[in-house]
Amino acid sequence: MRRFLPVLCALLSAPLLQFASIQALAADSPKQIVLQISDSDPEKQTLVLNVANNLVKAYGPGNVKLEVVAFGPGLVLLFNDNANKDRVQSLAASDVRFSACQNTVKAMTVALGHAPKLNKNAVPVDAGIVRIVDLTAQGYTLVRP
């Protein structure tokens, strides 16, 4: 029985060591976060940008993969004449990606009679909600402030 005890201990401790290794790898990998903005309310826009800024400051630019997805009325955050355009540019310089829903752009083009002029940092995506679903499937955490 005594000669089996070391083998038994090794077998029982192996899963714990493997779990600890997985946890260590997860701690070292960049956080992946997607922020949803689908509301035209200026306070919501400010809140989303504040959250993005806080995440970049907390984790550091190289330690967080952060994407703001704007669709529906929230697309106005990425209009070129939006009051927050300098904040968008500053966050984009910290590797925050800003995705602009092209379905919304098309609908707004019809409603406005012309295509909205978007911030130069806006990256077009076919459908904002699909982008969010795809990112969450890749392990991103969805935050909707």
Predicted regions and their residues:
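Bacterial N-terminal signal peptides
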Residues: 7-20
